[in-house]
From Swiss-Prot:
GO terms for cellular component: cytosol; GMP reductase complex. It comes from Streptococcus pneumoniae (strain Taiwan19F-14). GO terms for biological process: purine nucleotide metabolic process. This is GMP reductase. Disulfide bonds: none annotated. Gene3D superfamilies: Aldolase class I. GO terms for molecular function: GMP reductase activity. The active site is at residue 176. Keywords: NADP, Oxidoreductase. Catalyzes the irreversible NADPH-dependent deamination of GMP to IMP. It functions in the conversion of nucleobase, nucleoside and nucleotide derivatives of G to A nucleotides, and in maintaining the intracellular balance of A and G nucleotides.
Length: 328
């Protein structure tokens, strides 16, 4: 039962250092393998319209990073797969669970993407299980990610249906208001939910949402994530598709949730909101900084590679890691 587990989130945890065994953090290897491909970092930008478009996806793939293209340009998905494959790059797309998506999956047989993410807000659903089975039947070599979920039962059921990885996180994101609108979700205890789900998982877990700092990446790995999906930290870059808006002479980029009125175009089952983020520099600068911070984390763990973060001790500090530090 959940009540037997301690409940905590990212800001409640500090990882405990081990003796360093490398001469420089540059020796630490941040790469991670998911399916048949190895990527430079265990992070993936959220598959949201204000985070990435085809150009950003291409930039990420060329740089050796994992990406998941969003599903909100449905007609553009097959041309996108061709565009990526023509350049020798991996194709990674998203699908929903509506009836027409079944025909769409059949159309992919001639040029199957390497990765498909079944992407709905409440992924522990018969509709998702049915779609996993359909993709696995039609495209047996495609790596299927399914979500989002927040319980061990959901992880096991999606894995048993054929999912190659599950995405864990219901509403912990900065622009997700599922927790407020519905009363449900992993907001405020996302890291504990990840730990709970990871104990049941036999296949990779992608932690999705609630990441506010680069240190949260290391914490996610400690509690069982193979890959971490990140929204707000990847939003607001020069390359980001979100609109640039000027307020009092300052540049901001818009960032909105996948079920917001801005994305849906109407007040219809809205579970996302729009915020403005101060415009950042280039996406590559953030990726490089993430890599360096993760290398430092690996060195503090007394390790040489990402997996070494899984074995460190931790302490629950209940919101005290920011005490005396207003800079966060």
């Amino acid at each position: 039962m959940l009540n037997e587990f301690p409940i905590f989130d990212y800001e409640d945890i500090q990882l405990i250092p081990n003796k360093c065994v490398i001469k420089s953090r540059a020796e630490a290897d941040t790469s991670v393998t998911l399916g048949n491909h190895t990527f430079k970092l265990p992070v993936v930008p959220a598959n949201m319209q204000t985070i990435l478009d085809e150009n950003v996806a291409e930039q990420l793939a060329k740089g050796g990073y994992f990406y998941i293209m969003h599903r909100f340009d449905e007609a553009g998905r097959i041309p996108f797969i061709k565009r990526m494959h023509d350049q020798g790059l991996i194709a990674s797309i998203s699908v929903g669970v509506k009836d027409y998506e079944y025909d769409f999956v059949r159309q992919l047989k001639t040029d199957a993407p390497e990765y498909i993410t079944i992407d709905i807000a409440h992924g522990h659903a018969d509709s998702v299980i049915s779609m996993i089975q359909h993709i696995k039947k039609e495209l047996p070599d495609t790596f299927v990610i399914a979500g989002n979920v927040g319980t061990p039962e959901a992880v096991r059921e999606l894995e048993n249906a054929g999912a190659d990885a599950t995405k864990v996180g219901i509403g912990p994101g900065k622009v997700c208001i599922t927790k407020v609108k519905t009363g449900f979700g992993t907001g405020g205890w996302q890291l504990a939910a990840l730990r709970w789900c990871a104990k049941a998982a036999r296949k990779p877990i992608i932690a999705d949402g609630g990441i506010r700092t680069h240190g949260d990446i290391a914490k996610s790995i400690r509690f069982g994530a193979s890959m971490i999906m990140i929204g707000s930290l990847f939003a607001g870059h020069i390359e980001s598709p979100g609109k640039t808006i000027e307020v009092d002479g300052e540049q901001f980029k818009e960032y909105y949730g996948s079920a917001s009125q801005y994305q849906k175009g109407a007040y219809k089952n809205v579970e996302g909101k729009r915020i403005l983020l101060p415009a950042k520099g280039h996406l590559q600068d953030t990726l490089t900084e993430m890599e360096q911070d993760l290398q430092s984390a690996i060195s503090y763990a007394g390790g040489r590679q990402v997996a070494d973060l899984k074995h460190v001790d931790y302490v629950i500090v209940k919101n005290s890691i920011w005490n005396g530090d207003a800079s966060h």
